[in-house]
Amino acid sequence: MKVILKENVDNLGHIGDIVKVAPGYARNFLLPKGFAIEATEKNAKALEHAKRHLEYKKNKVLEAAKQLAAKIEGLSLSIAHQAGADDRLFGAVTNMELAEQLKANGIEMDRKRIVLAEPIKQLGDFTATVKIHPEVSATLKVAVTKA
């Protein structure tokens, strides 16, 4: 008997796979537990439609992430901080401050998505990586000046 998996099933397959199983396994386990549906032509067409729709949404989100990355790449943030005589900051520039600066520039970004290679504790020009999407990241330029 052929079934379409609705869940990942160990030693059988992943979501959306069409697999051939024993009729008893399908009737007594997979179908009642909701792990699979019978592989009829109607269900197969619905599965293909759902896959196409999911792929379309995925591409749309990826395209929006690429546009946001281009916008972030074009930005250069300037942060004024108090510093001592040797240009060392009192404190450090954090990803939270960078998120607030991005918000002031019209880009809403969670601070956890902004990654600093090392803490910014001196005056100068630095870069930070912004992880927008698992496949898309942008480099943000940050200039730290004396307040």
Swiss-Prot record:
This is Large ribosomal subunit protein bL9. GO terms for molecular function: rRNA binding; structural constituent of ribosome. It comes from Citrifermentans bemidjiense (strain ATCC BAA-1014 / DSM 16622 / JCM 12645 / Bem). Binds to the 23S rRNA. Pfam families: Ribosomal_L9_C, Ribosomal_L9_N. The keyword Membrane does not apply. Keywords: Ribonucleoprotein, Ribosomal protein, RNA-binding, rRNA-binding. It comes from the Bacteria. The gene is rplI. SUPFAM superfamilies: L9 N-domain-like (SSF55658), Ribosomal protein L9 C-domain (SSF55653). HAMAP family: Ribosomal_bL9. The keyword rRNA-binding applies. One of its GO terms (cellular component) is ribosome. Belongs to the bacterial ribosomal protein bL9 family. GO terms for biological process: translation.
